[in-house]
Design a protein with these regions (language model features):
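Short, polar N-cap/turn motifs at the start of nucleic acid-interacting alpha helices
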Residues: 58-62, 141, 163-183
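Catalytic-site neighborhood detector that most strongly recognizes the C-terminal catalytic loop/helix
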Residues: 74, 171-196
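Basic, Lys/Arg- and aromatic-enriched nucleic-acid-binding interface segment
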Residues: 2, 13-43, 47
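C-terminal secondary-structure termini that scaffold catalytic or DNA-interacting sites
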Residues: 1-10, 198-203
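C-terminal catalytic core of Y-nucleophile DNA break-rejoin enzymes
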Residues: 5-6, 75-94, 109-132
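DNA/chromatin major-groove-contacting recognition/catalytic segments
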Residues: 14, 18, 81, 184-203
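C-terminal catalytic core of tyrosine-transesterase DNA break-rejoin enzymes
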Residues: 38, 42, 150-173
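Conserved tyrosine-mediated DNA breakage-rejoining catalytic core shared by Y-recombinases
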Residues: 52-89
Length: 203
């Protein structure tokens, strides 16, 4: 049962599209909320890790880093890890810096990547509330949470053929078993697997 509960948590593509489509990008925090969701979907960071990132964590010089080093001080289980950035994650960083600069927030090395209205770090609970309100606005299941975007990231890695050990390292799991609970096989993938057997073997 535990595997079932974990496996069912990741959102489908259509759910993410509806969620992102429900954001008012002209509202005070709309664009940041949009970028936050996309960033998690492409890095798999926990919300507590995301909200404690500084500009220096993700930027070298004037460009996004190739990867982010997550210190043991902010990770679950106090184990440091490195998470690579793909092109979409890098673009999120650029847009976040632009967002912060235009709204008068510092973009200095020690400044929060996700600042709050007090110019401090965005509280994790506030980020969760933002997603909850958005989810309710567009009529999606309560399973859509910041953590579910991490599950979405894990499933995309699995579907791309990433091996379980590498996935566990990127996600910061102590055990591959934990990573496997984050992933499940979609109906489409199961159909494709069975269809590959057609024309082979007995008929």
């Amino acid at each position: 049962m535990r595997n079932k509960l974990h496996a069912d948590k990741h959102p489908e593509d259509w759910e993410l599209k509806r969620l992102l489509g429900g954001i008012n990008l002209r509202s005070t925090w709309g664009k940041r909320t949009y970028l936050m969701i996309v960033f998690i979907c492409h890095t798999g960071l926990r919300i507590g890790e995301l909200t404690r990132l500084t500009v220096a964590d993700v930027v070298w010089g004037e460009e996004p880093r190739e990867e982010v080093f997550l210190s043991h001080r902010i990770t679950k289980g106090q184990k440091s890890r490195v998470v690579p950035f793909n092109d979409i994650a890098k673009q999120c960083v650029r847009k976040l810096l632009e967002f912060n600069r235009k709204r008068g927030f510092s973009i200095g090395p020690e400044a929060p990547l996700f600042p709050w209205k007090t110019h401090g770090f965005l509280p994790s609970r506030e980020a969760e509330r933002e997603i909850q309100k958005l989810r309710e606005k567009v009529g999606l299941s309560p399973k859509i949470t910041p953590h579910s975007f991490r599950h979405y990231f894990a499933n995309r890695m699995k579907n791309a053929g990433v091996d379980p050990f590498t996935m566990a390292v990127i996600l910061g799991h102590a055990s591959v078993d934990t990573t496997q609970m984050y992933t499940n096989t979609s109906s489409a993938n199961k159909r494709a697997a069975v269809n590959r057997l057609a024309g082979k073997g007995v008929a």
